[in-house]
Amino acid sequence: MSCVHNNTSFPVQIEAYLKEVFEKYKELQESKDTSLTARFARVLKYYQFLIYSAFSDPKFGIGQGENTRGLLIYHQMGMGKTILSLSLAISLSHIYNPILIAPKSLHSNFQQSLLKLIKLLYPETTDHSKELQKISRRFRFVSLDAYNMGQQIIKAGGSLNGCLLIVDEAHNLFRGIINSANDKTNARQLYNNIMQAKNIRILFLTGTPCSKDPFEMVPCFNMLSGRILLPLHYERFYTAYVNKTTNSPLNADKLLNRLVGMISYAGNQNELNKLFPTELPLIIEKVEMSPEQYRQYLLARDVENAEKHASSGMYEKMNTAALCLPGSEQESGSSYYVRSRMISIFASEMLTVKEDEKLSEAVQQLPKEAFTENSSPKIACMLKNIKTSPGPVLIYSQFVELGLHVVARFLEIEGYQCLQPLKVLEEGHNTILLHKDGKDLMVKNFAEDEPTHTLVLSSKITRFTLITGKILSKERDMIQQLWNSPLNIHGEVIKILLVSKTGAEGLDLKYGRQVHILEPYWDKAREDQVKARIIRIGSHDALPPEEKTVQPFLYIAVANQKMFYSIPEGSQEQKTIDERFHERGLEKSHLNSAFRDLLKRAAIECAFNGESGCLMCQPTNALLFHENFERDLRLPNPCQPLVKTEVKAYSISYEGKQFFYQKNKEVGLGYTFYEYNPIIKAYIEIKPSNPLYIKLIKHVQAGTTV
């Protein structure tokens, strides 16, 4: 069976296909079959196996032939997108060259997941190194954040022709494309290379598509379709698909028609939700700035406003270029209110940065007296909340020097010890981690097949550590192993982990009980990504039921009330930058969430999972959309709702096949005929335009009914 996504029959065909795959999945799980497909059925979750089958089946067509080139794997964070993509890479590596594009910090995650997958696939093998080496040789890794990404791709395979391209954290690529002012950026060059590639299969992995703007969909689905499926210009896209008055999707039915067949979604099924810890309602701490902090904040705002005024008008007459967000030309030089946002976290008169001195060094040289509740009411509030946590705690800030490093100094003053790796040494199956107090820490590899764990640490000291973009991958992996150790269920080894945006990507953490987000961001999906580092499938399985909860906190700096009301009326900014970012994020989140709901409705598993609002059409084999999006908007919607009804009909046999018919005076020729469709396992109406229709009328009128 081959299915083409630009066809009204596609939705019912894919639903029927997935039902067959699911039955096969249940059979293979109980079998002793040693084929690769059977092995994957015993390893993968059912929702992973559905996509594995649909994508790898040469007869079905997802990502092949006249169909789309691949899928947006929109699976809730923590549901195993990495394992799914590696499974497909292994299965298809004899046909396509696997190329993984991901932030450099995530490459080791994929390599570790690959070893884990091989162990699960071949449990009868004791030495997995040969199989790992054999499979690893087929993989090529490219750093999404590298300045020479294009050269890495050429080195990896010469071109993207004939490759299976896996892009992890794909939302970063989509944003990079639409934030580019020209075609010279890495992201835009990759977009052009993908669009020009031949015989390419694509897997875009993300738990947060459409997180910045719905316009992110344009590069995503153009690359997946291999053509200009969605309009390249921001204004044309918004005119066609966004109702700015209601802040909601416009022409949603026509957009759904274009997207169907290119999305896999998994995330809100009840049986899956049971595997996650309970996320408690977000606690928003609105923290009043101290007088000195607010004074410095106002000075920073004056500077930012002056810079904004100086640059205003420079781009007013510039039309938005293709694949660009409005203002992306300016944003490359924008401060994004960095000064005022950092001061909202920490402000001290003692902080001075000398020429050629790094900000982090200046923070380290500050005396203990600089770290008080007055210099950072936010951090003081956060520390009080942390003391109530019964288990490990995750702290996030996008600011490292005046965010995480300041928090680290506060923690040290409070008596916490920083477990900071200086060197990681491999010794057989053991790993030695040298940290800054000079003592050796012996750690057994915490793999599932390693039953014993050796840890040399004082239980009297409460520890914290940091993961930022600058940390080496081996150190990052070791910190994750320590956090996930069965000996760290309640934070006995690492109580607090501080992470930046880059540092948080790809982390898979267990046991976490609190998440602290030190400042709001206008992209609420980022907050979800941070929480998803510890809210994952099975992450709290080792804890008793009453401890399987995660409490998130968000900290928002507000004006010092006494000083605010002393400012002449009309001169005050009514809301702080923190408040404005938070409110803008909520507003933007509403629109982005509505478009993510459309992606769920267009997902190939939607009807199979019994979701509501799924795109399901009468299987008339008509084109689902016109290639020209403007003309498509003017045409009637070819997707007529699929309605299943029982009718009384007569049976007729013609040329060895069974048909049914009704006498129907409302039809021009007086008959309605039905034929069996094996794909959807139901009878569908034969249209009068079908040549078979006239033949069946003559057959009935000749009196040969059965």
Curated annotation (Swiss-Prot):
- The reply to whether Nucleotide-binding figures as a keyword in the UniProt entry is yes
EC class: hydrolase
List the signal peptide residues.
Answer: none
Protein location: Virion
Sorted keywords for this record are: ATP-binding, Helicase, Hydrolase, Nucleotide-binding, Virion
Question: How does this chain assemble?
Answer: Part of the viral DNA-directed RNA polymerase that consists of 8 polII-like subunits (RPB1, RPB2, RPB3, RPB5, RPB6, RPB7, RPB9, RPB10), a capping enzyme and a termination factor.
Instruction: Tell me the function of this protein.
Output: Putative DNA-dependent ATPase required for providing the needed energy to achieve the termination of early transcripts.
Can you say what this protein is called? Answer: Termination factor NPH-I homolog
